[in-house]
Amino acid sequence: MDKKEVRQLIMNRRHELSDEDIEMQSGLIIDRLKKSDIYKTSENVFLYMSYNREVDTYMLLSQCFMDGKKVYAPKVLSKTQMEFYCLSDVNDLVSGYMGIMEPSDICDKAKIRDGLFIMPGLAFDYDFHRIGYGGGFYDRYLSEDNTFIKAALAFDLQLLESIPYEEHDLKPDYIITQTQFIRREN
């Protein structure tokens, strides 16, 4: 399968999940993350705002605020540029690029590139390759200097034995599903 076929396969699988399945499985994934040292020791959490039947990151956003973490969310500035901005609460979010919630204009741009970085993706494999939506926003953002711990949140159905990849594709350090917490060995 090529990347386009993998994207379609996973989107079809996610659309077969009921709202209740997404809520339950997302809860298990967030619970697995919040019990981990990578979450407990991170002051800063950079996370995507879920849409299109992704793992529900709004659960994580609420948990981060309860735990006193500094939370940053992405805002698409152009077809090739994305930046992260600090959120003080969920009311800082407004509808943005493709209808995805993003920080409003009152939010301050992140001045750091350090902490726990939650990566989105459609498909992952056990070699930590990742297929996103094809825009390259996260590969570009993460290619700049940073000291992030990169974690991908995914449903088990998004984890495949092998997926097509290119050498420049960035890999997460961890993949967390409702049943697995997988750490990449360097």
Summary of predicted features, one role per range:
Residues 80-186:
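Conserved phosphate- and dinucleotide-binding cores of soluble alpha/beta proteins
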Residues 1-112:
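N-terminal active-site beta-alpha-beta segment that forms phosphate/nucleotide-binding
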